[in-house]
Amino acid sequence: MTYTLLLLSVILVVGFVGFSSKPSPIYGGLVLVVSGVVGCAVILNCGGGYLGLMVFLIYLGGMMVVFGYTTAMAIEEYPEAWGSGVEVLVGVLVGFVMEVALVLWAKEYDGLVMVLNFDNMGSWVIYEGEGSGLIREDSIGAGALYDYGRWLVVVTGWTLLVGVYIVIEIARGN
């Protein structure tokens, strides 16, 4: 499971590096949809079945509509791919090398083990016992997101705002 999660995380980051290298809107939308599917697979791999399904339906449904309009507005006769510019290809390769270096650095200093073992989850456990519980981890995760991850919510909101700005700029053709 650890290697599957690590592989999905690397694919997710490489997909976002591929999207941020500003290819044609057709290819950018495809990479963003594939990265969204991989992100949902990460959530499913961590045990969040309901959350993974909701992210899949809401995020990918919205992105399909946005990129459908973007592709219709910014249609090109010869769309620009990642290999058409040397600087774009170098940017993708540098991003990939940085990701591999980060994984190797985290593995060398036992940072990867600390992240993937989940040793400090004692404060998240609400129901312990032999019987069946009525509280699922998905609903606990939403509460923990707003309790422990206040800045994560702020960064997520800012990222969504920047994403909307990028989509508008791509649709205008700049």
UniProtKB/Swiss-Prot annotation:
Report which superkingdom the organism of origin falls in. Eukaryota
UniProt catalytic activity: a ubiquinone + NADH + 5 H(+)(in) = a ubiquinol + NAD(+) + 4 H(+)(out)
Molecular function (GO) terms for this protein are: NADH dehydrogenase (ubiquinone) activity
Q: Name one GO biological process term.
A: mitochondrial respiratory chain complex I assembly
Q: What cellular component terms from Gene Ontology apply here?
A: mitochondrial inner membrane
Q: What class of enzyme is it?
A: translocase
Q: How does it sit in the membrane?
A: Multi-pass membrane protein
What are the entry keywords?
Electron transport, Membrane, Mitochondrion, Mitochondrion inner membrane, NAD, Respiratory chain, Translocase, Transmembrane, Transmembrane helix, Transport, Ubiquinone
What are the subcellular locations of this protein? Mitochondrion inner membrane
Presence of the UniProt keyword Transport in the record = yes
- Coiled coil, from the record: none
Question: What is this protein's function per UniProt?
Answer: Core subunit of the mitochondrial membrane respiratory chain NADH dehydrogenase (Complex I) which catalyzes electron transfer from NADH through the respiratory chain, using ubiquinone as an electron acceptor. Essential for the catalytic activity and assembly of complex I.
Protein name, entry field = NADH-ubiquinone oxidoreductase chain 6
Identify the species of origin.
Hylobates lar (Lar gibbon)
